[in-house]
From Swiss-Prot:
UniProt-listed SUPFAM superfamilies: Ribosomal protein S16 (SSF54565)
InterPro entries: Ribosomal_bS16, Ribosomal_bS16_dom_sf
PANTHER family per the UniProt record, alphabetical: 30S RIBOSOMAL PROTEIN S16 (PTHR12919), SMALL RIBOSOMAL SUBUNIT PROTEIN BS16M (PTHR12919:SF20)
Coiled coil: none
Protein name according to UniProt: Small ribosomal subunit protein bS16
An example molecular function term from Gene Ontology annotations: structural constituent of ribosome
Length: 81
């Protein structure tokens, strides 16, 4: 089963998350099928904190991918994505 979730990147104490489509059995930061977007919780005021490709999100949900609760919450809290 394919799931859309966060994969952690960045360095220690400075997280940066990629929003990825991956197999549910893979580890959090393991191989993924496609990178759909990103989330930067420490973005400066001039930077964009989150970006997601809506067309790819629609495609993956259309073929049966589940969205993790965290990604659902991020999408609801950032409607301008």
């Amino acid at each position: 089963m394919v799931v859309i979730r966060l994969a952690r990147g960045g360095s220690k104490k400075r997280p940066f998350y990629s929003i990825v489509a991956t197999d549910k059995r893979n580890r959090r930061d393991s191989n993924f099928i496609e990178r759909i977007g990103y989330f930067n919780p420490q973005a400066a005021a001039t930077e964009q904190a989150m970006r997601i490709a809506q067309d790819r999100l629609t495609y993956w949900t259309g073929v049966g991918a589940q969205i993790s609760p965290t990604v659902v919450r991020l999408i609801k809290n950032n409607p301008a994505v």
